[in-house]
Amino acid sequence: MNYPFPGVPSRPSLALLSALACLSLGTQAQTSPPAPSADGSTEVMLAPVTVQDSLAGETATGPVSGFVARRALSATKTDTPLIETPQSISVVTRDQFEAQGVTTLRETTRYTAGINSSYFDNRVDSFKARGGDVSQYQDGLLRTYGTYNNIKVEPYTLERVEFLRGPSSVLYGQGSVGGVLNLTSKRPQAERLREVQIQLGSHGRKQIASDMTGSMDEEGKWLYRLVAVGRDSNTQVDHVKDDRVVIAPSLTYRPSTDTSLTLQALYQKDKSGSITQFFPWQGTRLPSPYGQIPTRTFISEPGWDKYDSENKSFGYLFSHRLSPQWTLRQNLRRTISEVDYRTLYTSFAANAATGRPARPVFDANGRTVQRDAVWQINGGRMLLVDTQLEGLLQTGEVQHQLLAGMDWQRNTSNQSNWRGPGTALDVYNPVYGTFTPPSASRLVRAPNVAQRQLGFYLQDQLRWGPWTATVGLRHDKAKTETEGRPAAAADDSATTKRLGVTYQAGGGWAPYVSYTESFQPLGGVDFYGTPFKPQRGKQLEAGVKWIPEGKGISGYAAVYGLREQNRKTNDPGNPLNSLQLGEVKTQGFEAELIASLARNWDWTLAYAYTDAKISRSNAGDQGQRVASVSRHMASSWLMHRFAAQGRGGWSLGAGLRYIGPQWSGTSAIDTPSSLLADAMVAYDAGDWRLALHANNIGDKVVITQCLSRGDCFYGERRNFLLTATYRY
């Protein structure tokens, strides 16, 4: 991630304790019953389409036992076996969350092939893959709009995370070339669950959480779920909190087997601050006569610095089977977010009198830095709705799973801000209190930005013997308006396509090839008032999947080539501005294996090679590597449960994560590679479980990113997490 220059919308809020309940996902596979065929008709009703996997009861949104999922929703918006999907996709299950001690969204994907989630930031969740950013969705609807007017996701509220690699606009509309990270919320399920969880960890972490679900009546027509989290914690950076309160209720009404309506709501309040300190190159990546800047150093002002956020969302998931062949679905969500963001950071401003360049540097004494200040009150509003009609047909020997859809969204952001000079600070011996905070009357309201998008899409999954073809077409219209700036308005439209073919060769092997496109309207203007052009991407991918029936194994290997136009990047000559590159060309190879083996072994293995270069540019950087992209990434996690039946007893696990060096955009500096180790030990006594996790057990000082504009960022140091879970 290229960390935006401090001062774009955002804000977390105060949060202390909390605990309650949650419920379990109960989405059932919709298998149409056989229907009589009409005599003499060339178009007959499809008997139950063979999209059902050997693992009975598994659905693309429900709980999975172990690490290996066999079905996914993200690639097709239909409940489809992974082996039939002509695109690489990974699923991280709830069981894997718990085994690896996941506490943030970025930790869910750290053992997933090709996605870089090492960025240590309390403000936002960000990911990179295949040389580009990754779009975030939740329950099939866009999750984020803007930058610092969003919240970080609480992983305890999630059932699973799906990562679809590469351009995916045919189904989702706006999206980047890196792929789509789709989060599946915990949903009500019929099987009763009562769970209470207590965590103690490094930096004074104290968290209590609860998850409850079950049926409210004997017929099972009404199901509920309640998830709650309360946390009081510090961080590895002095004076920065990580407090949170989350309450996420949901209610499902199923009057018949044909109809289901799930109401969802979420309230989240975070109280945090800036752990990204924008340190100079010297003292982090480059040597300093006073040594390395301590990772705990806080550049801002205690008592004033904050990133406080509040988020409220509500919506529904509706499904109704119109006939044995046709099903209507509609998903809707409304989100309201508010962020209060205040911080001081190492100054990027040039000073001709002292000779200071326009990047973070030490003063002449080599110890102090000049600081600038920013205060933002950011707000965001999102309204999203996706309506789908799915049908099952057969023409001759070819089975068709049709999907026609229309989605619409309106997203707005507002901001009031203040910027001003700060005071100097000795980073090796900080003394605070020299900065005088501004009053609220100094805040200046910025123009509101609104974006509307309307999309129509059509998809056909054709099955003929061992062959599966997926064909898709979509048209989008997007309009972005900035209040009081008609010249900055942008009307964008695009038609995107998708074609993929899979051949099931037997033994669980399935080679595939696919072509996909992406379209992402950016909206807004650069520092000089020029509207940003929409980003566009195209990808060709070929690979093979190995998902043998009856075995807990899921693996894939793929090669790909993609091109992206109009990518935004930092302007090294003006840290307040963003540039758009002409074209980026990326090619690479990825491989991943996830296995839940006999004798209670769970294993993940992942590798990715990414070669991303600027292929066309007017900025004089044609042929250079894309900044902040590692050519090589690899990881492996191995866990063994010593109990004979996988229930009760001791478990031991350990993992390694490698991220290769990254080009920073200048030959003056790079981001070094890192190799980190994690470990866990747990005891399961049936109703209760006690687990101890250690991340970065070698306590390595990691630099996750250095940028050409002059700053570097630290990663997370060693931390421990003790979790006690009781189910009753």
Set out the residue ranges of the language-model regions.
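Short acidic/polar hinge/loop motifs at secondary-structure boundaries
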Residues: S117, D125-S126, L142-R165, L183-S185
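Outer-membrane beta-barrel translocator/receptor signature
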Residues: Y156-E159, V170-P249, Y253-T259, K312, ...
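Acidic/polar loop-and-plug regions of large Gram-negative outer-membrane beta-barrel proteins
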Residues: R231-T235, A248-R254, D258-R321, V339-G380, ...
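Structural signature of Gram-negative outer-membrane beta-barrels, strongest in the C-terminal barrel
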Residues: T252-R254, G380, Q399-N411, P447-E564, ...
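Membrane-embedded beta-barrel scaffold of Gram-negative outer-membrane proteins
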Residues: S319-R321, Q325-R333, S337-Y345, P511, ...
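Gram-negative outer-membrane beta-barrel transporters
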Residues: P466, G561, Q580-T666, T723-R727
